[in-house]
């Protein structure tokens, strides 16, 4: 059992805020917002300032960093325009759909640098990324430089004493990509200097931003070759941290005790660890995505981050403004259809009094908190039986794992329900025709004449087909190695078998949700909108996009103070629970207390009536601005400015005089009753007293708009 304890991060930096009151919440802003810099690169062009962003996931959908880079592309392009270029490996299967190939215009140092590398035999693809913003792209074909791998490794050994195993293909590819990018940037700088001199421009100022250790090789090469380029390195999760947590170690209690070299060596990743640590220490500016990851990096990589760069979202993509409540109702009805089919023969609960909870992500049973989620559901089941027997919770676990096929019982249920619906529709049409004909003749319809024996026989056949002796399955697929599967083993241990007496029903869906799925028929985004609560009690989560996506879609969620998202919300919202963000303490209390707290949160949510849930969803959706890249992108700009000033001391960014944190702070809604914590001096943005009727007017209006009395 993991003891759950971590450490708070002290920040004595005094930050001044301009208080701006709003009738829904208090908003405290630091001096600048990224929107202030949206000029499509006009200022950057005049300053001859260039920004290169390097990641393995650029136009290459292979992980969470792809979401970060892709969603940030729009605001990055709005800020930097043609002075921005993104770089990564060329993967043909992804590039076909992600990239529009085209050459850079003549007289552009980018084109000159590309042609210079092509003359050396390197294959380079240029164009634009087919995402919002359409940033410029340079993708490097790793295979075209594989013949120089031994030379690259030799230089890495001579200058850094890092040896790369011959059989580690992933690291070999990272070495090739890193050297290709470093050579390109070196050539680009030379051409940019010449171009500036010929056109009487100021000297070029170049920033290269590298994400994760695979891209960090390029940073190491630039610094060891003494190329005058400002560098930023961002780690989204430390390499060693992932391995340690995957092994169920008591991670946060032992961060300062790990012998990092020994631990990396035992896991045969010492060379990768050295590359990550080398990039961390050689970068002019080092950033992490959250303070808790920063603390992890401080102990495992031995450098404290200079700036925290939280992950944002392109909120415009999820934005539904006044429609999100209606979208919830539409999506919920589609989930209702699944529930009718999956639980056929056992639908003894009212779907209007049924709540849908879900957990989703990579199948990391302990790291994602699935262990305590299932345990807390067992306790919730007991509490609901005692306190609210008319309320049912259906808990979905969406974790992709190896399966053999769909569960036959689940498929049969959907076929039976479809047959019943078709039969009822046919009978309904026949009854309607008979009623019309009877009325047309001037007679009052008789119930016995309307519903005939043939109709009753058809209905009875369908009802007999719906009878089942077994309980509804807990999984929609036949899971390979199901006797060892951690989710199924935990469900068995907690006796959550979907019996008639259980008020918590379990559905394990071991596959990503898509609109072509024959069971659900909806994609993940629509599924989230249809649920009532997302539960993500993670033990190791450097950021956590799943609860963030719930928030911008107006769906309340449970997170923890060991996730980057949870820490961020704790820091920026004085009473997160009022806004539908429930934060489980996995730092300072033991596992048993964390499970109890999670079950209490879920029970508290289950007690809410429909009106209260609608009001809470409205409050949750109001946090969207806090998670938008237009808000959080300012931290990336701050990191670039700091790197530029390290390499070019004369560089001054007049507009960058803003605080380093707390871009937005939300206080308690005025309609929420005060609590003792709101008076503590440590609580951010204490609530300002307002009229008690202030939110009630909004609630009535919201309900009226939705047609709910």
Curated annotation (Swiss-Prot):
- Could you say which tissues express the protein in this record? In third instar larvae, isoform B is highly expressed in skeletal muscle but not detected in fat body.
Which reactions does this protein catalyse? [(1->4)-alpha-D-glucosyl](n) + UDP-alpha-D-glucose = [(1->4)-alpha-D-glucosyl](n+1) + UDP + H(+)
Q: Which UniProt keywords apply?
A: Cytoplasmic vesicle, Glycogen biosynthesis, Glycosyltransferase, Phosphoprotein, Transferase
Checking Gene3D superfamilies in the record gives: Glycogen Phosphorylase B
The listed locations are:
Cytoplasmic vesicle, Autophagosome
Name the residue ranges with Low complexity bias: 677-687
What segments bear the compositional bias annotation Acidic residues?
A: 692-702
One GO MF term on file is: alpha-1,4-glucan glucosyltransferase (UDP-glucose donor) activity
Q: What InterPro entries is this protein classified in? A: Glycogen_synth (IPR008631)
Q: In this record, what's one Pfam family?
A: Glycogen_syn
Q: Which residues are listed for UDP-alpha-D-glucose binding in this entry?
A: 61
Q: What is its EC number?
A: 2.4.1.11
Ranges for region Disordered: 666-709
Q: Name one GO cellular component term.
A: cytosol
**Gene Ontology terms: biological process:** cellular response to starvation; cellular response to sucrose stimulus; glycogen biosynthetic process; response to sucrose
Pathway assigned to this chain's UniProt record: Glycan biosynthesis; glycogen biosynthesis
Q: Which PANTHER family match?
A: GLYCOGEN [STARCH] SYNTHASE (PTHR10176:SF3), GLYCOGEN SYNTHASE (PTHR10176)
Q: Which family does it belong to?
A: Belongs to the glycosyltransferase 3 family.
Q: How does it assemble?
A: Isoform B interacts with Atg8a upon starvation.
> What task does this protein carry out?
Transfers the glycosyl residue from UDPG to the non-reducing end of alpha-1,4-glucan. In larval skeletal muscle, isoform B is required for the formation of autophagosomes during starvation and during cloroquine-induced vacuolar myopathy.
The name under which this protein is listed is Glycogen [starch] synthase
Give the species: Drosophila melanogaster
Q: Cite the source lineage.
A: Eukaryota, Metazoa, Ecdysozoa, Arthropoda, Hexapoda
Q: What is the primary gene name for this protein? A: Glys
């Amino acid at each position: 059992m993991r003891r759950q304890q971590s450490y708070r991060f002290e920040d004595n930096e005094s930050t001044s805020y301009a208080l701006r009151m709003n009738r829904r919440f208090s908003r405290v802003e630091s001096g600048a917002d990224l929107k202030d810099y949206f000029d499509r690169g006009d200022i950057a062009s005049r300053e001859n300032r260039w920004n290169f962003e390097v990641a393995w996931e650029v136009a290459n959908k292979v992980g969470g960093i792809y979401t970060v880079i892709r969603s940030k592309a729009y605001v990055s392009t709005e800020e930097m325009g043609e002075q921005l270029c993104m770089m990564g490996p060329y993967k043909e299967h992804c590039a076909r759909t992600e990239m529009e190939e085209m050459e850079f215009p003549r007289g552009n140092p980018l084109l000159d640098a590309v042609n210079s590398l092509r003359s050396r035999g390197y294959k380079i693809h240029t164009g634009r990324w087919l995402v919002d913003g359409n940033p410029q792209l340079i993708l490097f074909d790793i295979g075209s430089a594989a013949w120089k791998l031994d030379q690259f490794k030799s230089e890495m050994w001579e200058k850094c004493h890092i040896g790369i195993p011959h059989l580690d293909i992933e690291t070999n590819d990272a070495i090739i990509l890193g050297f290709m990018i470093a050579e390109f940037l070196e050539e680009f700088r030379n051409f940019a200097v010449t171009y500036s001199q010929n056109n009487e421009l100021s000297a070029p100022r170049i920033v290269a931003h590298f994400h994760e250790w695979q891209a960090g090789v390029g940073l190491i090469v630039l610094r060891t070759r003494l190329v005058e380029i400002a560098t930023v390195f961002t780690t989204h999760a430390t390499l060693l941290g992932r391995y340690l947590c995957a092994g169920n170690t008591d991670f946060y209690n032992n961060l300062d005790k790990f012998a990092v070299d020994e631990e990396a060596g035992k896991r045969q990743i010492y060379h990768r660890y050295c590359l990550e640590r080398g990039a961390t220490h050689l970068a002019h500016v080092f950033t992490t995505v959250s303070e808790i990851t920063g603390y992890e990096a401080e102990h495992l990589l031995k450098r404290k981050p200079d700036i925290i760069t939280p992950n944002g979202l392109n909120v415009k993509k999820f934005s539904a403004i006044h429609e999100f409540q209606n979208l919830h109702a539409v999506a919920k009805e589609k989930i209702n259809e699944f529930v009718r089919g999956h639980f056929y023969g056992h639908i003894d609960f009212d779907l209007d009094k049924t709540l849908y909870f879900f957990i989703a992500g990579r199948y990391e049973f302990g790291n994602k908190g699935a262990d305590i989620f299932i345990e807390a559901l067992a306790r919730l089941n007991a509490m609901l039986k005692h306190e609210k027997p008319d309320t049912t919770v259906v808990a979905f676990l969406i974790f992709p794992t190896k399966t053999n096929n769909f569960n036959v019982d689940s498929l049969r249920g959907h076929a039976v329900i479809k047959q019943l619906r078709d039969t009822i529709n046919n009978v309904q049409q026949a009854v309607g025709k008979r009623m019309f004909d009877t009325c047309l003749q001037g007679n009052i319809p008789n119930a016995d004449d309307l519903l005939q024996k043939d109709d009753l026989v058809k209905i009875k056949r369908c009802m007999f087909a719906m009878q089942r002796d077994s309980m509804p399955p807990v999984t929609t697929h036949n899971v390979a190695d199901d006797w060892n599967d951690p989710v199924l083993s935990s469900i068995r241990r907690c006796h959550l078998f979907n019996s008639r007496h259980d008020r918590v029903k379990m559905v394990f869906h071991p596959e990503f949700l898509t609109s072509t799925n024959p069971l659900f028929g909806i994609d993940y985004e629509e599924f989230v909108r249809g649920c009532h609560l997302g539960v993500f009690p993670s033990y190791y989560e450097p950021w956590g996009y799943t609860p963030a996506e719930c928030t911008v879609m107006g769906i309340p969620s449970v997170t923890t103070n060991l996730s980057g998202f949870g820490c961020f919300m704790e820091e920026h919202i004085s009473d997160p629970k009022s806004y539908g963000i429930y934060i489980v303490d996995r730092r300072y209390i033991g596992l048993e207390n964390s499970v109890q707290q999670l079950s209490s949160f879920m029970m508290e949510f289950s007690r809410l009536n429909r009106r209260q849930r609608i009001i809470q969803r409205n409050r949750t959706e109001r946090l969207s601005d806090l998670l938008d890249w237009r808000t959080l992108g300012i931290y990336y700009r701050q990191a670039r400015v700091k790197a530029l000033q390290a390499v070019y001391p004369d560089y001054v960014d007049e507009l960058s005089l803003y605080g380093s944190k707390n871009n937005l702070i939300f206080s308690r809604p005025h309609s929420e009753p005060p609590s003792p914590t709101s008076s503590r001096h440590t609580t951010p943005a204490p609530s300002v007293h307002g009229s008690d009727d202030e939110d009630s007017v909004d609630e009535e209006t919201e309900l009226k708009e939705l047609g709910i009395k």
